[in-house]
Amino acid sequence: MKKTKFFLLGLAALAMTACNKDNEAEPVTESNATISVVLKTSNPNRAFGNAGDEAKVAKLTVMVYKGEQQEAIKSVENAIKVENIKCGAGQRTLVVMANTGGMELAGKTLAEVKALTTELTEGNQEAAGLIMTAEPVEVTLVAGNNYYGYDGSQGGNQISQGTPLEIKRVHARIAFTKIEVTMSQSYANKYNFAPENIYALVAKKKSNLFGASLANSDDAYLTGSLTTFNGAYSPANYTHVDWLGRDYTEIGAATVNTPKGFYVLESTYAQNAGLRPTILCVKGKLTKHDGTALSSEEMTAAFNAGWIVANNDPTTYYPVLVNFESNNYTYTGEAVEKGKIVRNHKFDINLTITGPGTNNPENPITESANLNVNCVVAAWKGVVQNVIW
């Protein structure tokens, strides 16, 4: 009889565990209130693929804190609102996150959640499921039903009525929207350029998830290039990943859904602190003006000029320091402080090549470099950067 009783109690415990799975093992609390939260996501733009992917909320999680203690947590899938979260009345803090994947959030203190970080991954490059966060917000809950960001028709205690809580992407997007070869008069009858690959040459590996700035002081970086350079912008802590490199495809209507760039994390340039600029780069071959291969004499001359990687290899690079200050760069769209990559922004780069490139794309470019860059910044907020090389 005792064995049967214990067996039934075990089944009941398992059933309760299963019921709580969707609520992230919701903390036990004496609830006399509920909170429902509706969100506003940032504007979608055409992703590297399907147009709506960048704004997709695959999993939405709301946490309720009483001081530092997590009082409630609830997640839903494919929705922009979480309803009837059981909690207590009084002063509370709401923390909202989206697309957190397998991140363990249940039971974390408010300080622990604020200290969370993320790393740039191959999965981020698929656009769908980009992680999003909103800064913690303090609310006063009353006994009964509370609604954050709703239109007021629900009754109950309305908080921030008509103004949903906005969550923003942790990532930014950098991409070429134009690569045009228009050699200047000095080079028009001598050289041409054939693009082959696009790289995120220098990209921050980690960022914070919360804070006025998500950029941290960690000096770890990623690169999509197989070649290791020794330049002023080369990070000391540098890891190669092949998913930050891709073959070049001609930019145009036929390839509108083909990626021309990458999703990256927020970063700040501080040379003396070991923090490097984010660099997007196009690699290819320097050729004669008619597209044929350079002669051995021409390659030797180009190598001696620092344009190609060897006297028998015409590979050359055109690096663009994204959102950087340079006389070769012009910007339109939203103003973003130079030297920074800021979350939830897209940096669209129009590159005009007017002469030979460089054999070390991680060195500073000269003001007389053969490129023009125009960058458009928007939100998703966008920056258009025009570059002339």
UniProtKB/Swiss-Prot annotation:
Function: Structural subunit of the major fimbriae. These long, filamentous pili are attached to the cell surface; they mediate biofilm formation, adhesion onto host cells and onto other bacteria that are part of the oral microbiome. They play an important role in the invasion of periodontal tissues. Fimbriae and their constituents are major virulence factors. FimA proteins from different strains have highly divergent sequences, and this has been used for classification. The sequence-based classification correlates with pathogenicity.
Post-translational modification note: Synthesized as palmitoylated lipoprotein precursor. Efficient export to the outer membrane and integration into fimbriae requires lipidation and subsequent proteolytic removal of the lipidated propeptide.
Family in the record: Belongs to the bacteroidetes fimbrillin superfamily. FimA/Mfa1 family.
UniProt-annotated site: Cleavage, residues: R46, A47
Pfam families, per database record: FimA4_C (PF22492), P_gingi_FimA (PF06321)
Positions annotated as propeptide: 19-46
Subunit organization: Fimbriae are composed of a major, structural subunit (FimA) and the minor components FimC, FimD and FimE. Head-to-tail oligomerization of FimA molecules mediates assembly of the fimbrium stalk, while the minor components probably form the fimbrium tip. Linear, head-to-tail oligomerization of FimA is mediated by a conformation change, facilitating the insertion of a C-terminal beta-strand into a groove in the N-terminal domain of the following subunit.
InterPro entries the UniProt entry points to: FimA_C, FimA_N, Fimbrillin
MF annotations from Gene Ontology: structural molecule activity
Miscellaneous note of the record: The name (major fimbrium subunit) does not indicate the abundance of the protein, but is derived from the greater length of the major fimbriae. In strain ATCC 33277 and strain 381, major fimbriae are 300 - 1600 nM in length and about 5 nm in diameter. In contrast, minor fimbriae are only about 80 - 120 nm long. This length difference is observed only in a small number of strains, including strain ATCC 33277 and strain 381, and is due to a loss of function mutation in FimB, a protein that restricts fimbrial length in other strains.
Lipid attachment site numbers (S-diacylglycerol cysteine): C19
Any GO CC annotation of this UniProt entry: cell outer membrane
Protein name: Major fimbrium subunit FimA type-3
Species annotation: Porphyromonas gingivalis (Bacteroides gingivalis)
Gene Ontology BP annotations: cell adhesion
Span of the signal peptide: 1-18
